[in-house]
Amino acid sequence: MSADGKFGDYGGQYVPEALMPAIEELTDAYERYVLDNEDGFMDDFRARLRDFGGRPTPLQRADRLSERYDREVYLKREDLLHGGAHKLNNALGQVLLAKYMGKERIIAETGAGQHGTATAMACAHLDMPCEIYMGERDINRQRPNVFRMKLNGSEVNPVTVGRGTLKEAISETMRDWATNVEDTHYVIGSVVGPHPFPSMVRDFQSVISEEARTQAREKLGRLPDAVVACAGGGSNTMGAFAEFVDDEETALYAVEAGGSTLEVDEEAGVAPNSASLTTGSEGILHGARTRLLQDRDGQIMESHSVSSGLDYAGVGPELAHLVDTGRVTAVNVDDDAALTAFHRLSQMEGIIPALESAHAFGYLESVVGPDAPDAENADDLGEYVVVNVSGRGDKDLESAIEETYERDIDIAPNMDEFTGGL
């Protein structure tokens, strides 16, 4: 990364003049507290991750998946982190940083509700008032997490503009921040936005790969041949990859949401997927240059995924750069494959994954499963594979049951009695 926050052609700071003082203040705080550990900030952060968050999370062998796929499959269990997802790593770090900076109010956006929940928990823990912006469509898809945010003392502001999803929630949160920069910190939930957010969020999330790398050496006596993680904005992806980037012997796979199809209708302004690394083009979104889903006129298209947390039209600039350089391989899994993987992991390992995480397991099935359509790529995964379980699926139960019933997923149990809701 360059001094101005660029990763090759991507990144940078494309924000209104009114936000530049806040961006500069945050950049200074990031360099002093996170990079230089001023006042023991990182020591404080890691202690809280341990005591409040429950780190380290285990690296667990998936016995039945290993047998099914004829290779050693290990799961990095971020679903066991306090709150049920990797999101606390970043939320706790940023809320603590805001406290060190003397800020008095926290705002955040959320899609699936996991980042909002993690931010609400961190604010309750650190005694900071908090407001969460969430698209109306996502509120309807993720009602349990809305209740959890409110239960932790945060306000939840519905966003009704556009499609009412993550993209619109980020835009509304940015507007709030621009109006209240003096006393407010915006806790961005992914490795997106203007510098220093992509680097800062990656650094807070890198504890995932830091632990996984050490645990792999302890359990396997070596590094894994491949690390697989789902990719929306890219926070769990970069967290799972960060400490492996310099290990050329470890392949890195970012699994995007292929939605219903990779075909894009530019005339209608609709991308029935959220695969910006696969089908997107270079542009500017939410303060950074990156790869995104846009039409010929540069207008952001509507994205789609069965998973709220992957339903985003862009991706983090560093991840886009790593794909361009060939260090990370971008792949995709459609809605049906993700839902099937959701049921398979639940039935075979007793772990109900978030629909986001299910995309990573869907890719595994597509490459090394008994009837794998992409079996020619099986050797690339190698003998030892680590899959990041970015979160647990409690939040997705209602939508997963509805989607399963509509799609007639082969391996799913009979859901007829539940189609009216849980």
UniProtKB/Swiss-Prot annotation:
<dbReference type="GO" id="GO:0004834">
    <property type="term" value="F:tryptophan synthase activity"/>
</dbReference>
<comment type="similarity">
    <text>Belongs to the TrpB family.</text>
</comment>
<dbReference type="InterPro" id="IPR001926">
    <property type="entry name" value="TrpB-like_PALP"/>
</dbReference>
<dbReference type="InterPro" id="IPR036052">
    <property type="entry name" value="TrpB-like_PALP_sf"/>
</dbReference>
<keyword id="KW-0663">Pyridoxal phosphate</keyword>
<comment type="subunit">
    <text>Tetramer of two alpha and two beta chains.</text>
</comment>
<comment type="function">
    <text>The beta subunit is responsible for the synthesis of L-tryptophan from indole and L-serine.</text>
</comment>
<comment type="pathway">
    <text>Amino-acid biosynthesis; L-tryptophan biosynthesis; L-tryptophan from chorismate: step 5/5.</text>
</comment>
<feature type="modified residue" description="N6-(pyridoxal phosphate)lysine">
    <location>
        <position position="87"/>
    </location>
</feature>
<protein>
    <recommendedName>
        <fullName>Tryptophan synthase beta chain</fullName>
        <ecNumber>4.2.1.20</ecNumber>
    </recommendedName>
</protein>
<keyword id="KW-0456">Lyase</keyword>
<dbReference type="Pfam" id="PF00291">
    <property type="entry name" value="PALP"/>
</dbReference>
<dbReference type="InterPro" id="IPR006654">
    <property type="entry name" value="Trp_synth_beta"/>
</dbReference>
<dbReference type="GO" id="GO:0005737">
    <property type="term" value="C:cytoplasm"/>
</dbReference>
<dbReference type="InterPro" id="IPR023026">
    <property type="entry name" value="Trp_synth_beta/beta-like"/>
</dbReference>
<keyword id="KW-0028">Amino-acid biosynthesis</keyword>
<dbReference type="InterPro" id="IPR006653">
    <property type="entry name" value="Trp_synth_b_CS"/>
</dbReference>
<keyword id="KW-0822">Tryptophan biosynthesis</keyword>
<keyword id="KW-0057">Aromatic amino acid biosynthesis</keyword>
